[in-house]
């Protein structure tokens, strides 16, 4: 009975790792693929992480061009967790925009991003690599990142995928 449980656990770990493994090759982005900006309330659950995982898989296949990720939750853990994911999937160059005065998830009863960011190895080092160095509060404001990314693209050529709130989108529409 014990061996069969260990075997099943091993199979489960193998199955899960194959779903979230790093990309095996660098994808070539073709000019006709959709250009995407992800708007996310990443932090208190895993739906956003799964959506981001799917976008990385589309990037790997060359099916999209992910221009940036904007976060609409207050605090450093959502941005740090997004940096961990960008690094894990080998896309550290994807810019991250943050929001101030957004929804506060730092003290949520369930804060998935915080839990992952605080995992440490036995030697006290973070368990997951990050690409960005320094204070995550110094990342560009999401509306400013939107304006920058959208200004670099032809009109009507970018799709914004929103998972959660749309806090950073609103100021972009009212700003010059």
Task: Show the residue positions of the predicted features.
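Bacterial N-terminal signal peptides that target proteins for export
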Residues: 1-8
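C-terminal motif of bacterial Sec signal peptides marking the signal peptidase cleavage site
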Residues: 16-18
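N-terminal acidic, glycine/proline-rich low-complexity segments
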Residues: 20-176
